[in-house]
Regions:
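Glycine- and acidic-residue-biased ligand/ion/polar-headgroup-sensing regions
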Residues: 9-21, 29-63, 67-71
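Anionic coordination/interaction segments
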Residues: 1-32, 106-122
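TerminUS-proximal long segments
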Residues: 55-123
């Protein structure tokens, strides 16, 4: 997990908080989001409010799941959108678990079925 966002830790999971903040900033910098994989943890994000730097097409109340080992981020266009930005107003909570999560029947009912396509370039 990204340690700069980590707020709580147990032997089974960590909780990360994405809060409004300034980026590491320099006038000639581009605070670009980055690709990553959670090699040894499943990641669940709950989006509370604001614009998430690495994502597009989400809103308050959205939940995403990235199983261990699956590369993700950033969405197409987010590099370009980061140019000139000095901060973010994002608000989200992330849990990274060190054992695989099991998707419940209730979670399957709210799956939009197209999340995996959101990482592809739109033509």
């Amino acid at each position: 997990p990204p340690p700069v966002h980590q707020t709580f830790e147990t032997g089974a999971f960590v909780v990360c908080s994405f809060c409004p903040r300034l980026y590491d900033y320099h006038p000639k910098s581009i605070p670009a989001p980055y690709n990553h994989s959670n090699i040894d943890s499943d990641e669940v994000l709950y989006y509370v409010d604001g614009d998430f730097m690495s994502r597009t097409g989400i809103g308050p109340g959205y939940i995403s799941l990235h199983p261990a080992g699956i590369p993700h981020g950033p969405h197409p266009g987010t590099y370009e959108a980061s140019i000139g930005k000095k901060g973010t107003e994002e608000l989200a909570v992330m849990i990274d678990t060190f054992k695989p999560l099991q998707v419940t029947e209730n979670a399957l009912k709210i799956d939009d079925g197209k999340y995996y396509k959101s990482w592809l370039e739109q033509n």
